[in-house]
């Protein structure tokens, strides 16, 4: 018999790994026993499951939709290292899922690790009562009254970009091709800087900004194969996100840069408030964060939470609106007749003035239709995944047939099961939106009774801003900024693709922080369009 003292460290590690793998296997078998045995696509890889296949697809939403048609509105998808996810494409099931978020369904280990690494322990990282507390503290900054006050900021940034473009067109009238995505990034960053933190990053003026430089590097770099493999395996081993891959190092640099800027802005605002060097608007985003830091109530936030909120706002303000604006210009360049129709609506009312917040909200129906059609077709976030914190019974609006051949109108979800909602798939579903669901048709939003039979309960029947307790807090802010910027762009310029006769190129997905559009053949996430002034 081998003495205990002779057992090597490697032997102990191997034994511990064996025990860990055994516990994972037992846990997986227990979860499967508590979960309805659903049908689903066959596995393509013992190592990656179907995760790599979906990650590399140009349109994962279309793949999910085809699986829903074949296997029913809830199905089982093979994932990394033999694990599985349940994907739900049923309106009633999705409503149930979102209503129980932060308590019944929580962030996956991968999501929490990624969010913590990038932002810190803020609103989108938190769960349960902590999430409820932080959301309540921030809500006043995104009220209608607050957004109404910020509308002028959105227009100011738009006109700064217009001045820069006019200068470009005057200096080089024979070459009016502009990479619009780069400029949408700048307008979004400057707007969130001024509106949220009373700080002008100056990216529209050509000033160097460390945070803009790091953001832009995600648009020019392509994840290596090794980075991709590590990210996929991190779904089972989240600690792999700490490995020094090129993408993880870039993420760490982004977090460091955002935190440094957030620290400076927060310290400056504290001094302004304490020394009365300036007026800190209590209901501005940074004003509310300062208030929450010193609060003696349940709404108090720690220094770490405050910096995390600022990181989230910086990144969300940069990424989501810039992506949506870029997609809007792409779609309107594809359909010049719809671009002209939008321009006619805007110029018929506003030639020398700008719309008020009220007019942006409800006085420009075609602008509203264009914006929501872009948000429907091109949600910045393609899907969400959560893990069941407890056993659950999920109702279905459409019955399905299980692997055993049984027809059921609800499914059991075992504790620990990963459940996903394919947002892009649901936004483009022919079952919900009709046979032309994949087409850009703003007019659908103007049809009498449109959406009355749509069972999706998200904003305007869309899942773009998700739903339930985690509904995007800044959706009103994002839509107002989107509308203000687009109204200035379309009143001022015409847009078309620069190829022969405006030929439409292939639009691909660039894997940035969030997926971005890019024109095929371009180096990085570039979308060059021919821009001409409206005479």
From Swiss-Prot:
Gene3D superfamilies: Cytochrome P450. Its EC number is 1.-.-.-. It is found in: Membrane. Its main location: membrane. The keyword Ribosomal protein does not apply. SUPFAM superfamilies: Cytochrome P450. It is a multi-pass membrane protein. The keyword Metal-binding applies. The chain crosses the membrane at residues 7-27, 225-245. Its cofactor is heme. Signal peptide: none annotated. Pfam families: p450. Heme binds at residue 472. Belongs to the cytochrome P450 family. This is Cytochrome P450 monooxygenase claP. It comes from Ampulloclitocybe clavipes.
């Amino acid at each position: 018999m081998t003495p205990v003292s002779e057992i090597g460290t490697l032997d102990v590690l191997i034994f511990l790994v064996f025990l860990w793998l055994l516990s994972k296997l037992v846990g997986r078998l227990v979860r499967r026993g508590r979960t309805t045995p659903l049908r689903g696509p066959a596995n393509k890889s013992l190592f990656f499951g179907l995760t790599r296949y979906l990650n590399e697809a140009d349109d994962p939403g279309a793949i999910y939709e085809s699986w829903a048609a074949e296997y029913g509105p809830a199905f089982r998808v093979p994932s990394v290292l033999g694990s599985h996810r349940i994907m739900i494409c049923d309106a009633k099931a999705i409503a149930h899922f979102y209503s129980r978020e932060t308590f019944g369904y929580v962030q996956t280990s991968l999501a929490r690790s990624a969010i913590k690494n990038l932002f810190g322990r803020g609103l989108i990282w938190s769960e349960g009562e902590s999430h409820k507390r932080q959301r309540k503290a921030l809500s006043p900054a995104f009220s209608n009254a607050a957004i109404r006050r910020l509308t002028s900021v959105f227009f100011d940034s738009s006109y700064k970009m217009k001045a820069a473009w006019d200068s470009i067109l005057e200096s080089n009238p024979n070459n009016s091709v502009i990479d619009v995505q780069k400029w949408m990034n700048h307008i979004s960053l400057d707007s969130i800087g001024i509106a949220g933190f009373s700080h002008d990053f100056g990216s529209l003026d050509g000033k160097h900004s460390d945070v803009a430089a790091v953001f832009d590097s995600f648009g020019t770099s392509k994840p290596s194969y090794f980075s991709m493999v590590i990210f996929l395996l991190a779904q089972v081993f989240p600690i792999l996100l700490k490995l020094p891959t090129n993408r993880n190092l870039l993420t760490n640099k982004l977090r460091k840069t955002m935190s440094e800027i957030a620290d400076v802005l927060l310290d400056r605002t504290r001094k302004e408030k304490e020394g009365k060097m300036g007026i800190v608007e209590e209901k501005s985003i940074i004003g509310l964060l300062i208030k929450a830091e010193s609060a003696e109530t349940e709404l108090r936030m720690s220094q770490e939470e405050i910096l995390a909120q600022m990181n989230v706002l910086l990144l969300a303000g940069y990424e989501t609106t810039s992506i949506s604006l870029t997609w809007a210009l792409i779609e309107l360049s594809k359909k010049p007749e719809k671009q002209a129709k939008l321009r006619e609506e805007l110029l018929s009312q506003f030639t020398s003035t700008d719309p008020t917040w009220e007019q942006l909200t409800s006085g420009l129906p075609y602008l509203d239709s264009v914006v929501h059609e872009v948000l429907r077709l091109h949600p910045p976030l393609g899907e969400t995944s959560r893990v069941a914190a407890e056993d659950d019974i999920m109702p279905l609006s459409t019955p399905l047939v299980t692997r055993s051949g049984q027809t059921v109108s609800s499914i059991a979800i075992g504790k620990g099961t990963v459940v996903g909602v394919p947002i892009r798939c649901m936004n483009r579903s022919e079952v919900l939106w009709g046979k032309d669901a994949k087409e850009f048709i703003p007019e659908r939003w103007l049809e009498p009774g449109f959406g009355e039979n749509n069972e999706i309960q998200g904003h305007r029947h869309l899942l773009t801003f998700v739903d339930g307790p985690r509904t995007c807090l800044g959706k009103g802010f994002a839509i107002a900024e989107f509308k203000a910027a687009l109204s200035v762009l379309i009143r001022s310029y015409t847009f078309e693709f620069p190829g022969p006769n405006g030929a439409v190129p292939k639009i691909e997905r660039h894997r940035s922080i969030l997926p971005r559009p890019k024109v095929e053949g371009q180096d990085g996430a570039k979308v060059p369009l021919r821009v001409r002034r409206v005479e």
